Amino acid sequence: MSWVRFTKTGVAVVATSAAAVLALDMTNERRFQRQVKDHFRTVHADRLAELNKRAPSALPTRKDILTNLSKGEEFDVLIIGGGATGAGVALDAQTRGLKTALVELDDFSSGTSSRSTKLIHGGVRYLQAAIMKLDLEQYRMVKEALFERHNLLEIAPHLSSPLPIMLPIYKLWQVPYYWSGIKAYDFVSGKRVLKNSFFINKSQALERFPMLRNESLKGALIYYDGQHNDARMNLAIILTAIRHGAACANHVRVEKLNKDETGKVIGAHVRDMVTGGEWDIKAKAVINATGPFTDSIRLMGDPETARPICAPSSGVHITLPGYYSPSNTGLLDPDTSDGRVIFFLPWERMTIAGTTDAPSDVTLSPQPTDHDIEFILQEIRGYLSKDVSVRRGDVMSAWSGLRPLVRDPNKKDTKSLARNHIIEVGKSGLITIAGGKWTTYRHMAEETVDRVVEVHGLKTENGCVTPGLLLEGAHDWNSLQYIHLVQDYGMEVDVAQHLSNTYGDRAFVVARMCKMTGKRWPIVGQRLHPEFPYLDAEVRYAVREYACTAIDVIARRMRLAFLNTYAAHEVLPDVVRVMGQELGWSSAEQRAQLEKARTFIDMEMGQNAKQTAVSNVALNLTKEEMQRAKERFQQLDKDRKGHITVNDLRKHFREHNQKIDERVLHELLNEVDLNKNGEIEIAEFFQLYSGLKGGQLTGNRLVGYLDEIHGTPSVNRACGGI
């Protein structure tokens, strides 16, 4: 049911229902809190204290881990899949005293786990469904998510933090409706509430979020959820498991599952995608934690499986410049044109928006489409002030992630599929964990290991100790740590903050790897890109964090591919060069890595979608319009080469006393360069103006700059463009 269809009468019914449900739960909630506190502070207190001691030694190398995996010794547990769920299972199993192995086809967090909305949801959307549909399962999911959110913020404070999210209200009847729902969320949160929600009036809302549309605005509700760096969080779980003794390797593919004479799975035959080496891994239990690829592994274990249990759904997000949102407040649009929700959030000094939700095929390389991107932009335009021009050219990156939703055969649309999980035991003994969401990865892992121990009769040293178990970088971290990096190493403040919030207490290890700048300030820290705080030393450290490809670095160790595809392209040569030094790559391998990374950025990070928006436009210019566009082209191509380079743009702007940042110059060229050859040809110029005239494009920065300089009407204005 759409949010806007509720009436004032419905509000009263909802509030009454919510009060009844929550009143009945009050006693159980308090009892549950006491049980959790008593259990994990007494039963496993000694074990947890031992495990939470910071390991001073370096991580084992990938070569050491592969040697351990290929020795032929039997593991208690072999996990297939290195996303959030697989990583959580590895950490849980290893800290119970089980000998644990994990293999991942690509990189840790290369799939869905790095392509989320970056929120640690307490489940506010599920609470609405629980109340409106009297759905007890959804309500339990909310309670589970609230506990897990609290735990995640505690065990990795350097990678996560509370984020206030604004819910703007444009109709008076929505005030009590949303207020009662958000207050119910606070109530269910109990002691785990991050901060109490509150209502602010129109002027306060605009002061907090100045770019918000002010027409008919009545006020806004502010509630709190968690936010994190998803790929780094995933990696922190993996690194913690490795430090406790687990053997976890990325870029290792399962070729087949090995079985005994009775058909029971007893391990897997694997292949190292880096070296090509193959071997068998023996295991008493094998766990399938492959997210959207769940069914392919299930079919290896039990070919007679009747039908799939996973229904993948594609969710697209986009990245916009940081000025699109305040640095400390997100926005929730609870009622988009298709009945879903859109989040608009500050993240890593940029702004991310999403998401879409549509059934999808399973693929290793999901790609955002221009249709998805335009849908998100259109929804954003509806909530932002008319003074804010939401431009297609401002989309710095876009990505698609496949949600591993559990299939319900009685429902066709993915909107109704809950993000809960199931644990299946196949006839072959293969354990499959499917579904779920980022926030509840730990609980899913706990239930999975419980089931594995039960089914396979494994002996553990202790029960689950992952609530309260600190992750890599959290042990000695505090929010003022970056000051020590500035004072002790002579780093720029934004660089020090980035290192502290990315590596936690391991930031000092990265700092010691930095080279001198040769300047008075900063003393150390060579930036890879002038607009971002990433350092060349981080590339070297990334190799120690098991980065094997340039994509591993730019997408997951550093998040530059998710933040700005142009900048990612620009730093790639330096990233490949440093990795080549660390890993001994030949010139041919470096060229191959560069090409693969460029393809990844273009295909999976939205660069091609932007080009498609222009390249699919048919030429529709009159003779006069083509002549006008040609004259504008020749103003830039003064030596009549037949194409425009970034040097031509630079010279033109300098001649007209326009100071344009070097990064922006490259972006202006890339937005029009359909052929991706570093040049703008006359045909591409005509294509651009045709798109502006036909309305397929809502604006172009290069055309806008040229109009400002020359003052003559362009096709953008004279030919009916939006």
From Swiss-Prot:
Residues bound to FAD are 76-104
Q: What is stated about the way this protein's activity is regulated?
A: Calcium-binding enhances the activity of the enzyme.
Q: Which PROSITE patterns match?
A: EF_HAND_1, EF_HAND_2, FAD_G3PDH_1, FAD_G3PDH_2
Q: Name one GO molecular function term.
A: calcium ion binding
State the name under which the record lists this protein.
Answer: Probable glycerol-3-phosphate dehydrogenase, mitochondrial
Broad EC category: oxidoreductase
Q: Which residues cross the membrane?
A: none
Q: In which pathway does it act?
A: Polyol metabolism; glycerol degradation via glycerol kinase pathway; glycerone phosphate from sn-glycerol 3-phosphate (anaerobic route): step 1/1
User: Where does it mainly reside?
Assistant: mitochondrion
Keyword Transit peptide listed: yes
Biological processes, Gene Ontology terms = glycerol catabolic process; glycerol-3-phosphate metabolic process; glycerol-3-phosphate shuttle
Q: What family is this protein classified in?
A: Belongs to the FAD-dependent glycerol-3-phosphate dehydrogenase family.
| Keyword Calcium attached | yes
Q: Which residues form the EF-hand domain?
A: 624-659, 660-695
Q: Where in the cell is it found?
A: Mitochondrion
Q: How is this protein annotated for GO cellular component?
A: mitochondrion
Q: Where does Ca(2+) bind?
A: D673, N675, N677, E679, E684
| EC number of this enzyme | 1.1.5.3
Sorted UniProt keywords: Calcium, FAD, Flavoprotein, Metal-binding, Mitochondrion, Oxidoreductase, Repeat, Transit peptide
Q: Name one Pfam family in it.
A: DAO
**Protein source organism:** Caenorhabditis elegans
Q: Which residues pair up as cystines? A: none
Q: Where is the transit peptide?
A: 1-43
Q: Which cofactor does it need?
A: FAD
What catalytic activity does the UniProt entry give for this protein?
a quinone + sn-glycerol 3-phosphate = dihydroxyacetone phosphate + a quinol
List the SMART domains: EFh
